């Protein structure tokens, strides 16, 4: 069960072969994680501290108004970890960027980079990087 995804849409969202390839690549650089049974992907604690200090307390980690470069926000329709309203709030506060764009990837979650619509994500990033600023 993938949080936030309608039950009828869950099958096929994340292709097995793609996840398997990611899992192998994620384990490779960490011999300590690979050596555990079962193997684990270890992550630094900093993200947990940031969650407690900023997200859970409602304090922003940074001020979007301080961003002064072209900015692309990409969000996924079913992202339960960083729901669309969060990106919309950031977008509204990008007051000093010379250009801003927000794109929603349909039928995607926080793991959209591994999901069936990942090519749309890649395409949007490529277009943004290649366009004249």
Which sequence ranges carry the predicted segments?
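Alpha/beta-hydrolase
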Residues: 1-69
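Short, conserved loop/helix-junction motifs that constitute active-site signature segments
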Residues: 64-67, 93-97
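Short beta-strand/loop motif that positions the catalytic acidic residue
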Residues: 67, 73-75, 79
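Conserved alpha/beta-hydrolase "acid-adjacent" motif
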Residues: 80-86
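Short, highly selective alpha-helical patches that border small-molecule cofactor pockets
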Residues: 87-91
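Catalytic histidine-centered segment of alpha/beta-hydrolase-like enzymes
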Residues: 102, 108-122
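C-terminal alpha-helix
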Residues: 124-132
């Amino acid at each position: 069960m993938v949080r936030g995804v309608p039950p009828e849409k869950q099958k096929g969202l994340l292709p097995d072969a793609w996840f398997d390839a990611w899992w192998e690549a994620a384990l490779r650089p960490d011999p300590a994680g690979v050596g555990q049974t079962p193997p684990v992907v270890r992550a630094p604690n900093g993200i947990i501290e940031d969650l407690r200090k900023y997200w859970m307390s409602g304090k922003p980690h940074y001020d979007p108004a301080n961003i002064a470069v072209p900015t692309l926000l990409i969000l996924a329709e079913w992202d339960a970890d960083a729901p669309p309203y969060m990106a919309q709030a950031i977008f509204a506060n990008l007051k000093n960027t010379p250009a801003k764009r927000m794109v929603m990837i349909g039928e995607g979650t926080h793991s959209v980079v591994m999901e069936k619509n990942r090519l749309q994500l890649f395409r949007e990033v490529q277009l943004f990087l290649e366009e004249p600023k």
